[in-house]
Amino acid sequence: MLPSTSLNSSMYGNGALNSRDAARHTAGAKRYKYLRRLFRFRQMDFEFAAWQMLYLFTSPQRVYRNFHYRKQTKDQWARDDPAFLVLLSIWLCVSTIGFGFVLDMGFFETIKLLLWVVFIDCVGVGLLISTLMWFISNKYLVKRQSRDYDVEWGYAFDVHLNAFYPLLVILHFIQLFFINHVILTDTFIGYLVGNTLWLIAVGYYIYVTFLGYSALPFLKNTVVLLYPFAPLIVLYGLSLALGWNFTHTLCSFYKYRVK
């Protein structure tokens, strides 16, 4: 079972809900409603989800302003429409098949890679990161320890999805066009291009994650979420100095998985 969170009150944590509202808006009820809509495609707003994906690249702050609007109108920070998750899953499947093609994998090897990437890299790691950030934000970043000031687990998961999408596009789509003819050529230009794409992708993940938690008015010191930029830049510099090609390591790992 996913960790549950206490109910946030009205906008910015002020006020209190009556018992009937609280029962209707428990974490379990929200989760059930979300999962139920996961199989009702006609009820999903794919146009709005696609709009969010676009703005995650051009203006991610606008995406989180919509989360504020949802809190005002539906009394929850997390998405109640799984359309974004569905589109992200489609992107992940298509790009992973592309990876299998670029790495010259057979049909069954590509299917095996797809299962690994979807259920372990995306779902498994995503649940782990979301739970970790949910715990850290509630334990250390909340301004006032109260049941009225609580980061929803669903919101932590949404922040991860928001940050994961640009990383996915950069590393699993854009990078595909450079792997065989540039990145894996065992030259300085090769690992410069590849590692720079990794720097941009992971850096964007950190930045979008920071924006997600800094958008919550009851959190403090969210700037600490930008601190991973320092070791990231150091690692990038060391990789260029040592000739360590991140993409080559990823491709070798993918091939090892499907043996």
UniProtKB/Swiss-Prot annotation:
It holds the Pfam family UNC-50. InterPro entries: UNC-50. Residues 104-115, 185-187, 244-259 are lumenal. Its main location: nucleus. It is a multi-pass membrane protein. Expressed in brain, kidney and testis, and at lower levels in heart. Keywords: Acetylation, Golgi apparatus, Membrane, Nucleus, Phosphoprotein, RNA-binding, Transmembrane, Transmembrane helix. Residues 1-82, 137-163, 209-222 are cytoplasmic. The modification N-acetylmethionine is found at M1. It is found in: Nucleus inner membrane; Golgi apparatus membrane. Belongs to the unc-50 family. Involved in the cell surface expression of neuronal nicotinic receptors. Binds RNA. This is Protein unc-50 homolog. It comes from Rattus norvegicus.
